Regions:
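Short acidic/polar active-site loop segments enriched in Thr and Asp
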Residues: 26, 62, 85
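A conserved short alpha-helix in the GNAT/GCN5 acetyltransferase fold that borders
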Residues: 40, 49-57
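A conserved beta-strand-loop-helix scaffold within acyl/acetyltransferase catalytic domains
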Residues: 1-28, 33
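Conserved GNAT acetyl-CoA-binding A-motif
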Residues: 57-67
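A short, internal acetyl-CoA/4′-phosphopantetheine-binding micro-motif in the GNAT/acyltransferase core
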Residues: 33-40, 69
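Short coil/turn segments at beta-strand junctions that form active-site/ligand-binding loops
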Residues: 5, 62, 93
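Conserved active-site alpha-helix within GNAT-family acetyltransferase domains
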Residues: 42, 46, 70-89, 96, ...
Length: 103
């Protein structure tokens, strides 16, 4: 059974971002990653994602994936800057492709 972890980022008791991870034996999948609009483009997303990645690696997960909508260029670029590489693209549910990244 996969374990799930919820990460919530706060500044002065104000929610600024969040993400979840599903943990398998030696892998993890990040989903639901978001940063509040007023905190985007200021380095918070990178800091939050790096913290999540560090925690997952400390838990022994080296194979980490995250999915992104192909039209979300800001998230796409953030994931690349954090060390993710495109593993595959797929187009279920929509006419535009999604990408699956792997760290």
């Amino acid at each position: 059974m996969n374990q799930r972890i919820q990460y919530i980022a706060m500044i002065y008791k104000k929610h600024i971002g969040m993400g979840s991870a599903s943990l398998g034996n030696d892998e993890a999948s990040i989903f639901g990653f978001e940063v509040s609009p007023q905190y985007q483009g200021k380095g918070f997303g990178r800091a939050i994602l790096k913290r999540i990645l560090t925690d997952l690696k400390n838990r022994g997960r080296e194979n980490i994936t995250i999915e992104v909508d192909s039209t979300n260029k800001n998230a796409f670029n953030l994931y690349r800057k954090c060390g993710f590489e495109v593993e595959t693209s797929f187009d279920y549910y929509r006419k535009r492709p999604d990408f699956l990244f792997q760290s």
